[in-house]
Amino acid sequence: MLGPSIKSIPAIVKEKLNCKFLIEDFQTVAVELHFLKKKPNKDEALANLLDEIDGQTMIYCQSPASTRKLIKSYLDIREVEMTQDGELLEAAKWTSDNYHDEWLVSVALRHGIGIHHGRLPRALGRFMIRAFEEGKIKILLCTSTLIEGVNTSAKNVVVYDSKLNRRSLDFFTFSNIKGRSGRMFRHFMGNIFVFDAPPEEELPFVDMPAINPGENTPSSLLINLSEMDVPSTLREKVDSLLRQKLLPVELLKQHSGIEPEYLLDAAKTLISLEVRELERYVWASRPVYDDIKLTSDLIWTQLGGAAAARQSSMRSASMMTFWIWRLYSSRNVPQFRREMIISQIERNTSPDEAVENVLAFLRGWASFNYPKYLAALNDVVNHVLQLKGLSGCNYLPFAMIIEHLFQPSSFSALEEYGLPTEISEKLLNGRVFNKDDSLDVVVNNLRNRKLDRFGDGIFEKRVIEDFQRGIGAKIS
């Protein structure tokens, strides 16, 4: 199954996969479209709607910043009662204690309102969905996570923003958002409320670049295709990458998460350096600040890392260097998190932005993209050093400790499964598993043990329960 609202795939895809494409237009619920007026006050119009409608409501916003702006506005213009639900209050206190008491995610929870976006820790995001499913949360503000793997729906869906990544919503995306309204066997009529006219219906066409490559197919994918799968129009482009002598083709293929053109640009820059300058890149395991700065500059300018770093709240190579250095110096995530939140607030950054900058950095850059780029740079630098007859470098140990955030290697995987580091620490200290255990051993131990005693209060106990269900435990 490809997904909803898809009407066509390329003929060549059907031919290569030897498949048939069937369209199914059956809808499990009816959806009614309602138009809201932006003027004179869009937020007041939304507040009036929330006063009037019954049932749970999802509100689509284009970004985490938009959710922050909207919840702040809503709580300013409406006196929303504090929730009486014990689990929500505990969740609000937990987020307040571990992040900041003015973080609007925590503030919203105190009023029985949920926020869900990609910067939230996985456990908190999973909690928001479960609390919404159980009816504890009546209003849930979402970003594109609404349509990217979040399996929930509501009687009412409000499209507050008609954009995604600063572009107008296309028909396919709008249809997916609309599809979150209503649920079979719960509410057969769904309501979708919009401030702007929906996008015009178009023929939703899904291409498959790995099977039907075109001009927009990334070079990193093209060089990994067999020769017969590369169309003649792209043959020259692919041949130029495969026949160049600057870097081994296997190196380009190995680092498929980075475009080969960027890898080659980095190599060209390094080759052009004088020996004295090139030798500055020869470091291993325990870098000083200038070592991190040197490699960060190259990642930012030549290796194409700037775009990914900006998505993780890094505004420059210098900022990226400073944050990596602070993390490396502290060697303690909770301490780093507290210090960086406080230091940003002292420079007049809002508590909301400060918290979410740190979350974005830890999840999107430090534990994911930075190790990927540093490992690629390690191979490029070593190749150039070898060409010049110089001693090699070894950035990989440093990349690994940053990726795991100075924690047992299993912690990052457990975090993605929905178990916060704070609870993993309790389990480790309680000898439920050992820091050197493989992930398989850890997961098996956690699946087959009764762990609720490690949770402080309802919230943590339910987080542990959600996590255990997610890894296949049978919870009575």
Question: Where do the PLM segments sit?
Answer:
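Short glycine-/polar-rich loops that comprise or flank the Walker A/P-loop
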Residues: 16-17, 55, 110-111, 153-156, ...
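SF2 helicase motor core recognition
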Residues: 125-130, 140-155, 179-188
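Long, hydrophobic alpha-helical segments
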Residues: 201-253
